[in-house]
Swiss-Prot record:
Its EC number is 7.1.1.-. Keywords: Cell inner membrane, Cell membrane, Membrane, NAD, Quinone, Translocase, Transmembrane, Transmembrane helix, Ubiquinone. Belongs to the complex I subunit 1 family. PANTHER family: NADH DEHYDROGENASE SUBUNIT 1, NADH-UBIQUINONE OXIDOREDUCTASE CHAIN 1. Signal peptide: none annotated. It comes from Ralstonia pickettii (strain 12J). This is NADH-quinone oxidoreductase subunit H.
Amino acid sequence: MIESITSFGTATFGGWWPLVWTLVRAVCIILPLLLCVAYLILWERKLIGWMHVRLGPNRVGPMGLLQPIADVLKLLLKEVMVPSAVSRGMYIIAPLMVLMPAVAIWAVIPFQAEAMVSNINAGLLYVMAISSVGVYGVILAGWASNSKYAFLGAMRASAQMISYEIAMGFALVTVLMVTGSLNLSDIVNSQNRGFFAGHGINILSWNWLPLLPMFGVYFISGVAETNRHPFDVVEGESEIVAGHMIEYSGMAFALFFLAEYINMIVISALTATLFLGGWASPIDAPVLNWIPGFFWLLIKVFLLLSVFIWLRASFPRYRYDQIMRLGWKIFIPLTVGWLVVVAIWLVSPWNIWK
């Protein structure tokens, strides 16, 4: 099918076809992503309601299914008020600087074999680079707002993101060591080889099992990176109201909100790709092989997003010093230690990744 589309596009658009095809694939990711964010918020409210033994949204549409549409319309109709004391240029560009990296990172995430916007060999390096850019938008928002609450939230966010990116980086290096490739498709394919995969039990050959500490560190660090509960001291309502977003309203505020939920989906998709076999089914059986790989990736992402929500419903917010201690004194030594263990494992006779 892809070959037919490529042939038709080349004949129709000529030399412009590569650019047109890239734009089409980008739109095919961005539009469903926006819909996913809307209904992820509904799922979050429904699941937390169920955990709290209440109904959650149930008034707009059947079973509250139109609640996200109502929320979007509400934000679109709200006036974007720019306070007089802000630095206007930085104030306006900050939400875009937070949102753009969250969307750009989807360019290299494989939905199934050869199904991605850009299949670059340095995909893992691209992920590490792009994921670090969002913090600049947060710092700009805090500085430009000319508010002590916004500035304090921005400083917390920058320190927290930098602290946990180190542990996440070490986890990614470990994945690179055992797979020998920076290409995300190669990383998925490498997880579906070996003894257990040869016997049809793919789930036991995925990276989560031999790299279990890295799997836990990467996902928990991802929760901290996205400033989600219990690491949401950046916008701690009882301390600094909304943190770096306090002076934003309407669609400007919605862009920050959108970026947060897109980043949740990004972390879940990357965790599924790097540690949970990506688009592969857990069991190599005829009854499961007919299901498209894209569907398996969606299931894994959905389950990981539900863990995000469960953490919010179950745990109290940590103090800021506890969050810093977890990142610097526990996660970084743990990842460095396991990095050494994996390095020794790779050169030993018991190397399971040969």
